[in-house]
Each structure stands twice: as structure tokens, then as C-alpha cells.
């Protein structure tokens, strides 16, 4: 595998039709066939598209975009989004994200930086339980990674959709988007609820939901089960190992 990577073989891209456009997957990524792409996070994609269905001219912020699968799946399924702003700090994934964003049928930008509640720098580290590049998390401070906030983009007063998959930095992303969220005509946010990440950070995802409620009223639903979530108890149940996605929609 290392020899193939050194020779650039794994940078070869397999192009798949997705809706009216083409989506590219590099060979070095986990093996993915067309059916895997079409059914990627199907419960999350279905609920997210349902929640944004009444939006017009929406802006989608994709935080932790990897190669752009989520944004592309949404744009293939929904006409609610007119602009995508995607972020991926991993230098291996970013060139493929940039190419996939350029192929979307809507205005789209890709930024090779992390998203948090400050503008500055940091570095990516891997947790002991997962060495995959998609599990790396941001450590603020001196480092090669640029960091920005959603509020920096000043998309105030618009219909806003946000996907956050940043391995434990969800609260920081939300704090850095508070003005955007508070001023939005409507807002839909997807947050990953990962038991191992919560164990590392000591923060149950309910804290993110409580923060959103402090800004404005939201409805919270688990994409995989359809369960409505209350903020009077932890999101993650004792002994839970399955990763869930919480879709938060303004009431």
C-alpha cells in the first residue's frame, strides 16, 4: 500500500454519476462503490433533506467535509441549497474536496482549514482508538492548520444549513456560528453523536443542543431512529456504541 501511495497510484480517482453531476473518489480512500455513495448515511441525508425542503436560496456549511460526500449527496437530492461552503483541514483529502465542489451544480467553495470559535491556527491529532484520517481532531495553538469561524463569512439573515463532523469540536463550531444561527431565516444543523468521541472529550452532545436552545427554539431528532430528543437528559445512552446523527431544525 505504501509503495502504491508513493507512486501516486492511489491518487487515481474513480468518477461516479451522482444526480446530474459526477463525484470523484480517490483509490486511497476506504473502498466505495456506486451503491455505497448513493446510500451514504441514508438516514441522515433523508432527514436533513426533509428538514431543509422549505428553504430557498439556502447556504450549506459543511464542516469536516472530507472529500465532499455529504454536500454532494444533499445537492443531488435537494434544490433548497444554492451555495455550499465546505471545510476540510486534512491536506490529503482537500484536493479531492476542491475538485468535487467545483463539479456541483450550485455555487461552491472549498477551504483547506478547520472550523471552531476563533480565527487562528492549530494542528490535527489522532485519537488512540482510531488512526484513520477522518478521526483527527483540532488542537488549538501553534500549528500548520488555519482555523476560521462560520460567522466570519457573514451569511446573516439567510436560510442556513450546517453539517458538523469535527470529532469533538462541535461546540466550538456552534459558538463560532452563533450570530449566523441566531439571525437565520431558518436553520438546520446536523451534529454527530459519537460515543467514543464523547468519552474522550467528556462532553455529551446534549450540551451542544442546550447551547442551540439558548440561541433560539429548535427541534432535535435522531436521524437513525426518528426519536425526538429532549435536552433534559444526555443524548447518549449508557453503554451505547452506535454513532448517531442529531438533526436540529428551527421551530
Segment roles from a protein language model:
Residues 15, 116, 123-126:
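A conserved beta-strand/loop capping segment in the N-terminal third of enzymes
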Residues 194-196, 225:
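Active-site beta-loop-alpha junctions enriched in small/polar residues
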Residues 37-61, 109-110, 118-123, 131-184, ...:
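Short internal loop-to-helix segment that lines adenine-nucleotide cofactor pockets
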Residues 1-100, 104-109, 153-155, 208, ...:
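S-adenosyl-L-methionine
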Residues 27-29, 128-132:
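Active-site/binding-pocket entry motifs
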Residues 185-194:
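Conserved beta-strand signature within the Rossmann-like core of class I S-adenosyl-L-methionine
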Residues 65-69, 91, 115-117, 166-168, ...:
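Short, glycine/acidic-enriched loop or turn micro-motifs at the edges of active sites
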Amino acid at each position: 500500500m505504501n509503495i502504491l501511495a508513493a507512486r501516486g497510484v492511489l491518487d487515481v480517482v474513480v468518477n461516479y454519476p451522482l444526480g446530474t453531476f459526477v463525484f470523484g473518489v480517490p483509490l486511497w480512500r476506504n473502498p466505495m462503490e456506486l451503491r455505497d455513495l448513493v446510500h451514504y448515511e441514508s438516514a441522515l441525508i433523508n432527514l436533513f433533506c426533509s428538514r431543509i425542503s422549505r428553504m430557498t436560496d439556502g447556504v450549506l456549511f459543511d464542516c469536516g467535509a472530507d472529500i465532499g460526500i455529504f454536500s454532494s449527496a444533499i445537492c443531488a437530492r435537494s434544490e433548497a441549497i444554492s451555495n455550499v461552503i465546505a471545510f476540510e483541514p486534512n491536506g490529503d483529502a482537500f484536493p479531492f474536496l476542491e475538485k468535487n465542489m467545483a463539479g456541483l451544480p450550485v455555487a461552491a467553495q472549498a477551504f483547506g482549514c478547520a472550523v471552531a470559535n476563533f480565527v487562528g491556527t492549530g494542528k490535527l491529532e489522532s485519537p488512540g482508538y482510531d488512526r484513520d484520517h477522518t478521526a483527527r481532531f483540532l488542537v488549538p495553538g501553534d500549528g500548520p492548520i488555519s482555523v476560521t469561524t462560520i460567522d466570519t463569512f457573514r451569511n446573516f439573515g439567510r436560510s442556513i444549513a450546517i453539517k458538523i463532523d469535527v470529532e469533538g469540536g462541535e461546540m466550538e463550531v456552534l459558538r463560532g456560528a452563533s450570530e449566523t444561527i441566531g439571525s437565520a431565516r431558518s436553520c438546520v444543523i446536523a451534529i454527530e453523536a459519537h460515543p467514543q468521541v464523547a468519552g474522550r472529550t467528556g462532553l455529551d452532545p446534549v450540551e451542544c443542543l442546550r447551547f442551540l436552545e439558548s440561541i433560539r427554539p429548535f427541534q432535535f431528532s435522531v436521524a437513525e431512529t426518528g426519536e425526538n430528543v429532549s435536552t433534559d437528559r444526555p443524548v447518549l445512552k449508557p453503554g451505547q456504541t452506535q454513532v448517531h446523527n442529531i438533526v436540529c431544525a428551527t421551530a
